């Protein structure tokens, strides 16, 4: 029997006990979502293992659709209008790049009567790029700023699995020796170490190093420990992948970010940097077209590893002119395959120059569209949506990737595309500017007069 005190105790009937373990944001839901997303991302990343990649190509990347499916399922049962309102503008910005490439390619196809096979190849690349972008958005929708941590864990698991699966083919001792030799000689890869050159994931670890070295939170002891742990892991996998052009690029942009992070920068600075990048690209294309880059690097004894030969072979396929409209998205893959079949090249390697590749494919107008969205409009957006530190993070990540665009094929890598969008968007979630409060403004002097009269009347007749 209850005592009098228990009977007289006021009960709070406003608190509702969840009827199920799966109420919104329950620990069980969050654990299941976390495990599911990590499994999907790690499984998709495992597709970068060379035996799997050689057998089925980029098909395992479609496993990442599971993350999008989880986000849709979660939204179906527990819709969060606030998060949807926060994410629709960045999503629209991200997808505008894909839409621009698609519609401009349609113009080129109609004008040049392109083959159906070329259109299919272009659309498939746009679809995979869209999957990467939407996966990043879905992960941020589910976990906000924690999405960066889960993404890091996933790619670390994938890279570790690839390292372990590659050992039986070479033996444990030979694998360790090959890896040590590669690290000591700064890239003299052979055997096991060559198997670990996972191009896409390696470049992604460079982006993560930039984030954890400069921008990751470090207020509490737990945050400091996590930051140090993930930074060490990313550095390890980054060095194991050993992309020599990426190492100085990471160091350079870490220093730039550290220099600018605490400084007050005028609002026009970052968009101006983007405009300067576009002008640099045009100058770079001119120098590539007329062999200036090749002669300069050869004069210093730098081995271009056949890049100058590929770049010169591309000259008949484009014009350095504002009237050049391009050949269509993914056209370069067509001519590379043609050169390989004709015996002009030993391996069907791409240009190793994504700036040239984009210009050949989408022409001068399309190139300006592609570069303006990424280098000018997106920094402007992040300044308005969040703050300058978010803008600095985006441009630091993009600047690092831009260095690789000049000598590699990273502009449309699946994981690089995903990381570039995910890191900035997740970081912006905690730095997003609150909406401006709405202040009543009178439409006319007559309205002000009526308001004043009403106030006088209330003060005259009010008993208070």
Spell out what each predicted region is.
Residues 63, 90-103, 113-141, 150-156, ...:
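Aromatic-anchored transmembrane helix interface
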Residues 106-115, 160-201, 340, 346:
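Membrane-interfacial helix-loop-helix modules of multi-pass inner-membrane proteins that assemble, modify
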Residues 164, 168, 258-300, 316-319:
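A membrane-periplasm/extracellular boundary helix in multi-pass inner-membrane enzymes
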Residues 298-362:
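Long extracytoplasmic/lumenal interhelical loops at the membrane interface
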Residues 209-213, 395-405, 409-446:
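Transmembrane alpha-helices of multi-pass inner-membrane enzymes
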Residues 2-80, 100-109, 166, 401-403:
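N-terminal signal-anchor transmembrane segment
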Residues 153, 157, 269, 361-402, ...:
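Hydrophobic transmembrane alpha-helices and their immediate junctions
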Residues 149-176, 195-260:
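Alpha-helical transmembrane segments of multi-pass inner-membrane proteins
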């Amino acid at each position: 029997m209850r005592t009098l005190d228990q009977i007289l105790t006021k009960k709070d009937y406003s608190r509702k006990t969840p009827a199920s373990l799966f109420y919104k944001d329950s620990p069980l839901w969050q654990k299941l979502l976390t495990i599911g997303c990590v499994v999907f991302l790690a499984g998709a990343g495992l597709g970068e293992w060379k035996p799997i990649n050689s057998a089925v190509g980029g098909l395992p990347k479609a496993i990442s659709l599971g993350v999008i499916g989880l986000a849709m399922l979660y939204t179906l049962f527990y819709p969060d209008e606030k998060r949807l309102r926060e994410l629709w503008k960045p999503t629209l910005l991200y997808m505008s790049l894909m839409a621009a490439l698609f519609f401009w390619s349609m113009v080129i196809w109609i004008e040049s009567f392109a083959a159906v096979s070329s259109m299919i190849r272009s659309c498939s690349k746009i679809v995979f790029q869209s999957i990467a972008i939407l996966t990043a958005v879905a992960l941020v929708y589910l976990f906000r700023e924690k999405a960066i941590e889960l993404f890091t864990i996933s790619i670390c698991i994938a890279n570790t699995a690839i390292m372990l699966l590659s050992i039986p083919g070479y033996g444990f001792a030979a694998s360790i020796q090959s890896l040590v030799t590669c690290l000591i000689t700064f890239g003299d890869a052979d055997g096991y170490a060559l198997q670990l050159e996972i191009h896409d994931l390696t470049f992604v670890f460079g982006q993560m190093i930039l984030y954890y070295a400069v921008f990751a939170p470090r207020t509490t002891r737990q945050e400091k420990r996590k930051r140090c742990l993930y930074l060490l892991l990313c550095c390890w996998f980054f060095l194991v992948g050993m992309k020599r052009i990426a190492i100085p690029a990471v160091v350079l942009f870490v220093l730039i970010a550290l220099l600018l992070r605490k400084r007050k920068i005028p609002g026009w600075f970052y968009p101006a940097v983007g405009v300067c990048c576009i002008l640099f690209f045009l100058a770079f294309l001119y120098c590539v077209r007329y062999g200036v880059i090749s002669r300069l690097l050869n004069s210093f004894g730098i081995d271009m590893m056949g890049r100058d030969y590929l770049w010169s072979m591309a000259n008949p396929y484009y014009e350095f002119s504002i009237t050049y409209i391009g050949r269509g998205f993914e056209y370069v893959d067509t001519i590379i395959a043609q050169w390989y079949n004709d015996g002009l090249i030993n391996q069907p390697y791409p240009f190793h120059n994504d700036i040239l590749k984009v210009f050949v494919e989408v022409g001068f107008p399309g190139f300006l569209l592609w570069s303006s969205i990424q280098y000018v409009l997106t920094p402007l957006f992040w300044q308005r949506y969040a703050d300058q530190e978010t803008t600095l993070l985006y441009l630091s990540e993009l600047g690092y990737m831009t260095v690789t665009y000049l000598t590699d094929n990273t502009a449309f890598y699946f994981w690089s595309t995903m990381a570039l969008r995910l890191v900035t968007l997740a970081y912006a979630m905690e730095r997003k500017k609150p909406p401006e409060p709405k202040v009543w403004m009178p439409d006319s002097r007559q309205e002000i007069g009526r308001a004043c009269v009403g106030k006088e009347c209330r003060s005259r007749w009010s008993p208070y």
